[in-house]
Amino acid sequence: MLPFTLNGSFDLHITDYCNLHCKGCVVLDYNQSGEVTNEKYTLDNVIDVISNLKKFNLKLEELKILGGEPTLHTDLNQIIDYIKSTNTVEKLTLVTNGLNFTKEVVETLTKLDRIIISIYPMSRSIESVFSKSKLGDMLSSKVHIDYLYQEYFFLYGYKQDGLEYNNELNWKRCLQKNDCRVINLDGLYRCTITYSEKKNLCEWNNRQEIIDFIESDIPLSHCKDCPMPAKTTKWETNNSPIDLKNSMRGLNLIKTWSQK
């Protein structure tokens, strides 16, 4: 059985804990209802997920480790070491808000291929502080760094005024279909929204079915209920005092690297 690489970028959610409380977070405040839609995985859970790829001799073009805030996971170092040892991922990425760059976390992050730092209004100075710090110089010399600005959140399921929507148009205009696939113990999703809704899952049953599912360019059944582009709203916090405190702590952590 020859190896096959599944195209696109796949999300692996390893924790439901975060040091920010974003209103409308797609995995921790779904539909602004407080619903948590992602898992909390141990190292053994991650091993079980990756074992399904190994069983079918499948690889991923990119795997993104997500939370919550993944740097808060106590087993993050072991999880990254294990994934890299399996040779099942061509590019290993971690998505973080950049507010927990402790010495131990930074040592772990140097093993990655790519880091995506999400920047929120409360911590918008993080790019400037990070890029001017010794930490920024050190990490960017080893790992590719991207910044994702989160001034606005999509309100999934809500239409923008003045636009036509239908199943095909929603699919064609969707930003999720290649970059926000999800892999978990149950199987694979082609979209983080269907993952949150627990719809359109391809289980770990048959290699060719998995390949056909991921390679398909046919809209999902849920696309008709998911207008794209969705209505947007300005980023807000559900807990301003805690988020401000954690943002200041995170920025100070980065600044301390300039003193080392």
Label each residue range with its predicted role.
Residues M1-E104:
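Conserved alpha-helical substructure of the radical SAM core
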Residues K23-C25, L76, V105-V106, V129-F130, ...:
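Short aromatic-enriched loop/helix-cap "lid" or pocket-rim segments at secondary-structure transitions
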Residues K55-L58, L109-K111, D217-I218:
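Flexible, charged surface loops at secondary-structure boundaries
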Residues N7, L43-V46, L76, I126-K132, ...:
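A structural signal for well-ordered alpha-helical scaffolds and beta->alpha junctions
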Residues V49, T108, L253-T256:
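Charge-rich, solvent-exposed alpha-helical interaction surfaces
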Residues N38-N45, V105-V106, S131, S196, ...:
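General structural signal for secondary-structure boundaries
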Residues K159-K260:
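Accessory C-terminal segments flanking Radical SAM cores
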Residues H73-L185, Y189-C191:
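Conserved AdoMet/S-adenosylmethionine-binding subsite of the radical SAM
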